[in-house]
Amino acid sequence: LQDAAIISHYFPNLSDKQKKQFAQLGPLYKEWNEKINVISRKDIDNLYVNHILHSLAIAKVIQFKPGATILDVGTGGGFPGIPLAILFPESEFHLVDSIGKKITVVKEITGAIELDNINADQIRAEQLKYKYDFVVSRAVTRMKEFYGWINTKVKSHSSHDLDNGILYLKGGDLEEEMDELKKRYKLYDLTEFFKEDFFETKKIVYLPVFN
């Protein structure tokens, strides 16, 4: 399974609208990637596994509630924010990146698939004035630096099964990197959720901010 069918395989309860939106992403990213490079050229054929399904790993760890607010930092072409926003249409997503061209792509794609629970802005995370329930990201920097940018952007009151904090998609050996932060965290191996080879070294780092 290499197209949108793989999403339905792992998330069997999608609505018709969600299935359509996921199916639209393939052609849209191919089209936009030729104009503005948001995914490496050799990787665009692996879009559904390496980018969309990878983003949705977060949904295997937490179910965002209606009204929840989620910040996606360094979203690039819209990952993990766009796939998560499709999956959780009643939650609110704010996608930010310091590179304007990437935000242009995010806005064009969300408009094309009529995804109305996303705001996208060209801004650095540390300049944001709001607070969110969760911050999500795909490995934009070492966790210690990332934590420094966003630890003041998380609401203290939690209404989810997990305390409010960071959900970070990252690969490789994370122990040394996490030890330098000296905070309590939990790792989830993505092989628990998905069987594709791509996920063998991939993890989610969950870091509650208030403890």
Regions found by a protein language model. Give the residues of each.
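Class I SAM-dependent transferase core
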Residues: 2-66, 71, 101-118
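Active-site capping/gating segments
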Residues: 173-211
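Conserved SAM/SAH cofactor-binding pocket of Class I
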Residues: 56-137, 147
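Conserved beta-strand signature within the Rossmann-like core of class I S-adenosyl-L-methionine
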Residues: 158-173
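Short glycine-rich anion-binding loops that position phosphate/pyrophosphate groups of nucleotides
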Residues: 139-142, 174
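A short, conserved alpha-helix within the catalytic core of class I
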Residues: 143-153
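Conserved beta-strand segments of alpha/beta enzyme cores
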Residues: 92, 117-119, 165, 186-189
